[in-house]
UniProtKB/Swiss-Prot annotation:
It comes from Drosophila melanogaster (Fruit fly). This protein is a component of ribonucleosomes. This is Heterogeneous nuclear ribonucleoprotein A1. Pfam families: RRM_1. Residues 1-13, 241-259, 277-286, 299-313, 354-365 have a biased composition (Low complexity). The keyword Nucleus applies. GO terms for molecular function: mRNA 3'-UTR binding; mRNA 5'-UTR binding; mRNA binding; poly(G) binding; sequence-specific DNA binding. GO terms for cellular component: nucleus; polytene chromosome puff; ribonucleoprotein complex.
Amino acid sequence: MVNSNQNQNGNSNGHDDDFPQDSITEPEHMRKLFIGGLDYRTTDENLKAHFEKWGNIVDVVVMKDPRTKRSRGFGFITYSHSSMIDEAQKSRPHKIDGRVVEPKRAVPRQDIDSPNAGATVKKLFVGALKDDHDEQSIRDYFQHFGNIVDINIVIDKETGKKRGFAFVEFDDYDPVDKVVLQKQHQLNGKMVDVKKALPKQNDQQGGGGGRGGPGGRAGGNRGNMGGGNYGNQNGGGNWNNGGNNWGNNRGGNDNWGNNSFGGGGGGGGGYGGGNNSWGNNNPWDNGNGGGNFGGGGNNWNNGGNDFGGYQQNYGGGPQRGGGNFNNNRMQPYQGGGGFKAGGGNQGNYGGNNQGFNNGGNNRRY
């Protein structure tokens, strides 16, 4: 059953209280699906009715504006088991209330600040490879996540030796998301590092903006949080700056470590990719202005509120406990008139900024 309760942030949360929570053995982020591009008429009930075809749903929510109580055009589905997400993703495309929606595995809250956490890509970077990691061993392992179309083990042109990393390309973005969510991977008994591989041109999009200015929001052009001043935490428009060195200490272009992809706020990444306009067809959207939630032109109808490049700035979505994972579900927005975020960034729309700024007036929601 769906219990629709209005909480302080104006969201309608549906939770199946009849499901035995002690039967859940996986972390919530492994069972949670982000749904973008929702029609403004879609309710918790409609969302659940569609996705329960692929498994038991323990939580469902269509995110709403805390003031207007209107849909923001996206929501979350939490299943009782991660395999149900696999089945739902195999059944794409999904159409709800006459509109094709874009489901994507939700990013864990601890990974929100990663510059490429919400990117939609089909190529996977695999680092820390050893000499015994050949193409076949890589294929044998990663083919369980999806259909592989190409494997490229990078070789030093001068010495002919392996440089310690490779790229695995799938025919879909979902296998990449699933691999990255799992985090720890062993090939031939040895741990390897996995990350989303972003094209170089993605580093250049988004323009100025930055994170400065009142309320911790964009200082330059509102709506441009990515590109040069925000996502490129390691400098430059280059994949190969900073992080762990997988290239035999060569430096320069051999660095493929933490945050080494730069990222920025643009380029088809984020939740939705491309130039999808989330919510601009809703009757209350006229004149609301920008509000980038995903980079690459993905507009989430937030009246000029910049949601920070393509980082997962919805805070990973509302959390509900299952088994030993997040048993205490905190209200995403707690407190009085200011709706100041509480509970360790539970459900915040703004990454590091603990909430989002209402059109630059320094009032926090």
